[in-house]
Amino acid sequence: MRQSSLSSSQWTSKWTNQRMSEWSAIACSWFSSLPEKVSWSGSPKKVALGTLWMLPLMLGGMATPGLAAERVAVRLGPFKQSVAISDLERFADTGEIPPGLQLYAPLLNADVRYTLRSRLHLDPSIGDKLVEDLLHSSAGERFLNTLQVAIPDASPTQLQVALMQAAKQPGGISLLGLLRAFPKQTVTIDATSAIALASQLNLPYWQSQALSSVLERELTVKSQPIRSSIDPTKAGSYWVWKQTMVLRDYQRERTIPVDLYWTRRTHGPLVVISHGFGADRRFLGYLAYHLASHGLTVVALEHPGSNVAWLTGNSFGQSRTTLKNNLLPATEFLDRPQDVSFVLDRLNRLNQFSSTLHGKFNTEEVTVIGHSLGGYTALALAGAKLSLEHLQQFCNDPNPVVFSPADLLQCSAADLTNAQADAQESLRDPRVVQTIVLNPAIGRLFDPKSLAQVTVPTLMLAGTDDTITPAVSQQFLPFTQLKGSKFLLTAIGGTHLSVGDPANLNHVFTQSLFIRERPEQETEALRQLLRGVSLAFVQQLTPEANRYAPFLTAAYAQSFSSTELKLRLNSQLPPNFSQRLKMAALPMEQLISSTLAKGKAESQQGVCYNKLNCLLGGLPLVMFILPGGVPLAANQFFRWRRKQQ
């Protein structure tokens, strides 16, 4: 696992430092073959260090089947170098470096080959709809404008066609396939803008890796063995019944499937599970069974406007044909909390009148567990008010920097009108007395004022390698803004789907290029810990509170750590850590925004005498910190930066 401290003088990780001298020597040796004096205005020169390394990431999603492109030309300031796509294909297929790529041999390692060979496994019918929704969304034009800055000689129409056709490729989308299919003989990439674009796509990695070593160091405690007669990770003694029901909300025209888990003897609060965008009610099935086996009644509901069936056009009670402007309807951010309140109302009736389920639902004491967008649902029910002004300010920026899929998703809510927002002044449901939010997508939906309204106990999970809902903006900063009783469970190395039920996950995506998830065997310890901690957290509302309290301690969580995942549990972050979080997020946002704003500005003329410093001087840090990659020459970069300052 790559780790890096937060200090500006120690950006690279211990792992990086161990290999830096080797890579620096290679890089410097390679550059020593260049002429001592490199002109900034003459004929094309050798491409800058790292440009080819960036190439696969720059080109993802930027090509179409049609006229086959033969070469790619990368422009970095006054430098311009082209390579044959066939040479890249040969390297990807065989591992051999053809003569046309010999110049870049030091950079063509196994990670680059893996990136070139990787495919995004996607059902063409689903991919086509997803891209179509994106292109017709309020963010679509901004997205295309950003791509056009990176590919300056491509028209908006070419980019749109490219994206649409790429999503239809059978067998998945490969980067070289996208490049080869672009309808131009030579594809020109503006490296500075493309690096900035790649930076936004990979900023979650930068944030995660920059914080990982700091978190591991500062959240670690001297652990003592937990002595107890019970093990909250083991299944309880009760036999669990499961029943599926379909509830119809005629007023809102929504059909809501629910899975009920209950036992012969029921006690404690009712547990409601809300899934994330594109998932379903079975995403946390293992956790539902576990909690129910200890005598808790669990209800897992499905949101018809944002579930996996909705993506394929087969959802109950929600037609995708009504969607015109966003990845999902803006009203879904109002409907989701209302789905839960509606289900509670119906369960209350069953609790009174059903012969089978009488007394099974404690609807006056409810714990809501939400994953991803379900985390938003839970906190909205707990009193956090959607901050429309805060959201629109971010989403309507003329140079928006959209760092993660979670940001794009949350911007769908920006199309809510003030009247709609005012009509739902508060989605708070007083029956919700606890929340467990796992990898929540909340960083843009709530501001500090709205999060301060959450007074119920909250357990939040953050994964430092989560590229869907990046930990810095979506969990760590929001956690510091909660004012009630709270716990932060940090999975250092954890990803977005690490807590998902392996029986209900598509394992293809754990090895995908764009969704970097861990195999289930590496994340089992986290799911085991979640079983124990969730049970202990819910039991705090029962007479068993003191008995389960030891399982809500830092030492207990830490005992589940593995080589792949370091697990920590804290009730608060270390002093001044909020400032460190802001330092991790804001400088890169400003850097990328300013880089994109420059657009196609002409490069400055001049002469560069120091080859390595000249080539590295204008590149953003995140160029060197990529998933699966090595931070090339980062030490030299920062030493030179300090000298210049």
Where are these regions (language model features)?
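Short beta-strand/loop motif that positions the catalytic acidic residue
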Residues: 454, 460-462
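Short glycine-enriched nucleophile-adjacent loop
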Residues: 348, 375-387
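Short amphipathic alpha-helix adjacent to the substrate-entry channel of hydrolases
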Residues: 283-302
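Mature extracellular/secreted ectodomains of secretory-pathway proteins
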Residues: 79-84, 89-226
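Cap/lid segment of the alpha/beta-hydrolase catalytic domain
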Residues: 278, 302-335
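Short beta-strand element of the alpha/beta-hydrolase
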Residues: 268-276
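Alpha/beta-hydrolase active-site loop
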Residues: 323-359, 398
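N-terminal cap/lid segment of alpha/beta-hydrolase-fold proteins
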Residues: 219-266
